Structures are given as structure tokens and as C-alpha cells.
């Protein structure tokens, strides 16, 4: 998901 690029916190859910 692209939101991981905007918010570092979302990277947990993006992976």
C-alpha cells in the first residue's frame, strides 16, 4: 500500500 510511503507507522501494516 502507498500509505506506507507517507507514514512510517503504516509500514507495519503495509508489509
Curated annotation (Swiss-Prot):
Induction: Expressed equally in exponential and stationary phase in rich medium (at protein level). This is Protein YadX. The lineage of its organism: Bacteria, Pseudomonadati, Pseudomonadota, Gammaproteobacteria, Enterobacterales. The gene is yadX.
